[in-house]
Amino acid sequence: MAHPHLLAERISRLSSALEKGLYERSHAIRLCLLAALSGESVFLLGPPGIAKSLIARRLKFAFQRARAFEYLMTRFSTPEEVFGPLSIQALKDEGRYERLTTGYLPEAEIVFLDEIWKAGPAILNTLLTAINERHFRNGAFEEKIPMRLLVAASNELPEADSSLEALYDRMLIRLWLDKVQDKANFRSMLVSQQDESDNPVPASLQVSDEEYQQWQKDIGAISLPDPVFELIFTLRQQLDNLPNAPYVSDRRWKKAIRLLQASAFFSGRDAVAPIDLILLKDCLWYDAQSLNLMQQQLEILMTGHAWQQQAMLTRLGGIVQRRLQLQQQQSDKTAFTVIKEGGMFSRRPHYTLPPEASASTLTLLLQKPLKLHDMEVIHITFDRSALELWLTKGGEIRGKLNGIGFAQTLNMEVDNAQHLVVRDISLQGTRLALPGTAEDSMPAEIKQQLETLENDWRQQHTRFSEQQHCLFIHSDWLGRIEASLQDVGEQIRQAKQC
């Protein structure tokens, strides 16, 4: 067997060759290639004239000496047109009911059936057996069929509660395609002179029969780690609890997991990774509503749970809460304390600043950030003389929030312990402290917990970086996952700096 990374590189080059001359169809080609390499079926939904049939024709070139069968279904299609005509000679001479299958579906590796939902019951029943068992009953004999990929297409979905649902359930990958959208791609498509029948794949990249058979065994050996299974089970439970979620059979889950194994194998990995689970969005939907629902659920899973993002934020919240508790216990030691000077016959006490507050400008830290004047405030800068006047005579006190801009009016008081307390509009208050106490405000146990959490974050980010190579996942997903991890990392770093 080729080295995993060499195999991944080869499959990437093979896909690039198949995509040549097809515009905005890279994702569809890659998923159809994955389906072909793992022996699964694909349903393409979209209007006429958007290269659905060309996608299927291209996949034939992925294999050496592959045979293709293509047919447009109508209400009048007969089994003979799909599975081959009856042998008049065998029926006449030997009384045998036998089809001549050369050139028809039973002898093709790549099959494309357009307008699939127009097929009659006789075709559908035989097709179900072909998909499920890869066998075709030809008269008295069961013949094995070589089909590696079935691509079915239509511009509509099957009607609910119809006889077509059984066949629809067998189509593991479901892709909703549209016209070419980008202006440059549209122009390139219009002026392209490429012959659709040309083989764009070098012989060195084509898959041999021996390779294909060996890969089927290798795919089954790809492991499903417990953490990845837990993510899958979480998704299954979420879908079961949502009122409008599609029904997903156990058979479909099992086939989907094999597709994830194939994704891991052809990406050069020996185990399914969380990144592979994104493929489930193309496997578990039924209609437009469930397609959007699956997109949302997978985004929640990938950006919130797959790399422990939400769990790390929950831990961070617990650490911050514990730090606040410890800081509250130590607040009397760190809080800025003024000196009471008022006599017993004074109508109100007055205060003076302690000796250590001798600078002309004083910066005092909020022990807990507050939102003041629509700003998140962590420190306030006072003019020393203005603060002394307020401590002596009361009245209005102003300070620069975070040391910037004009001095703003503050709701500030001296509490019973002679500490300065500033309050926000909801009257939530926090004590002020000298900057020198800030470094000592974070207990050692909190520092250690934050260090451990940051190390865990680095491990998760490294895991994502190592696993993100997956040909079959759109790059947009990688950007969203990276952003979610960076957000967690930034919150941890901010907590360490507070």
UniProtKB/Swiss-Prot annotation:
It is found in: Cytoplasm. Keywords: ATP-binding, Chaperone, Cytoplasm, Hydrolase, Nucleotide-binding. Pfam families: AAA_lid_8 (PF17868), ATPase_RavA_C (PF12592), bpMoxR (PF20030), LARA_dom (PF20265). It comes from the Bacteria. The keyword Metal-binding does not apply. Its EC number is 3.6.1.-. Gene3D superfamilies: 1.20.58.1510, 2.40.128.430, P-loop containing nucleotide triphosphate hydrolases (3.40.50.300). One of its GO terms (cellular component) is cytosol. Its main location: cytoplasm. ATPase activity is stimulated by ViaA. GO terms for molecular function: ATP binding; ATP hydrolysis activity. Signal peptide: none annotated. ADP binds at residues 23, 49-54, 196. PANTHER family: ATPASE RAVA (PTHR32204:SF0). Component of the RavA-ViaA chaperone complex, which may act on the membrane to optimize the function of some of the respiratory chains. RavA functions as an ATPase. Homohexamer. Interacts with ViaA. Belongs to the RavA family. This is Regulatory ATPase RavA. The lineage of its organism: Bacteria, Pseudomonadati, Pseudomonadota, Gammaproteobacteria, Enterobacterales. The gene is ravA.
